[in-house]
C-alpha cells in the first residue's frame, strides 16, 4: 500500500468567531478535493437550533400591528429570525417573552428552558411605548441548513401560530484557497487554507470538527464496499519535538528593515518559527527579497542562535561549503 506523509492541521484564531485553518502537505489535487467537501459540509450540514414558529398574544396573523409597539408583526418576525440559539434537545421546546411598559424588548428578555441558550441576548426584537405590551411564545427546534416558513407550517396548528423561516446553520462564511507547498525536492504538493466564520453558537474549531465527522461517516459507506481494497495510507504523525519558545516570536521583534519585513509578511511569514522553516532559496524566490535581505535575516537569526533551514548554526566559513549555496556579507 502506498503511504503518504501525514498532513498537519494548524489553526490561526482571527477572533472568537473566525479562524483560519491550514492543512499541509496534501497529495497533489487533494487540496481542492478536501477544501470543496469541507466548505459544502460546513455551509449546509452543521446542526443547529432555531425558532420555527411563534404565537404572539392578540395577533391572529403576521399582517397586522400591535398597539403600543413601534414595529409591525412582520418586522418583529424578521428580528426573531436573527436570534442565535443552542439547544440540547432533539424534540421541540418552548420559550417565552413577556415585556410591558416603555423600552426595548431584546432576546435577553426571553425566558428559555434549561438546556437552551441564547447566544446573542442583545438582539433587538421590538420597541414598546408606555402602554405597550408584548407576549410571545417561541417554538425552538434543532435542524440543519435553512428551512422556509412554508415548510414549518403545520396543517393542524392552532389559530395565531405563525411559522418562521429557520436558519439552523451556525456557520456564516466559509472560503478556501489552495497553494503549492514544498516537500523536500517536490514542489507540487497542496496547502489548503480554510477560512471559517461562525455565529456565537459554535466555535470555528468545533464546526470544522463536526464537518470532518460527517464526511468520515459518509465516505465510510464507500469503504464498506470492500474493506480490503487498497488506497493511499496516511503515515504516522511525526514525533513531537520540544517547542522552542523563540519560534513563536513575531518577526516584528527582529527589527528588520521595512523592505524585508513587508516581503516576509506578504509571503505569509509571521513568526520566527515560520521564517526558519525556509531555506535561503525559498526567501530569494520572494519578489524583491535579495541577498541584502538574506544577510540581514541571517544576522538577526544568528543573534538568537538560530539559522535558516539547512543552514549551520553560529558562525561559518562559506568557502567550506560545497556548491557555494551560502554567502557571507563579505562575498558580495
UniProtKB/Swiss-Prot annotation:
Catalytic activity reported: RNA(n) + a ribonucleoside 5'-triphosphate = RNA(n+1) + diphosphate
Keywords: DNA-directed RNA polymerase, Nucleotidyltransferase, Transcription, Transferase
Enzyme class, first EC level, given as a word: transferase
Residues covered by region (Alpha N-terminal domain (alpha-NTD)): 1-226
Coiled coil: none
Region of interest (Alpha C-terminal domain (alpha-CTD)), ranges: 245-332
Entry's Gene Ontology molecular function annotations: DNA binding; DNA-directed RNA polymerase activity; protein dimerization activity
HAMAP family: RNApol_bact_RpoA
Name of the protein: DNA-directed RNA polymerase subunit alpha
Organism: Bifidobacterium adolescentis (strain ATCC 15703 / DSM 20083 / NCTC 11814 / E194a)
Gene: rpoA
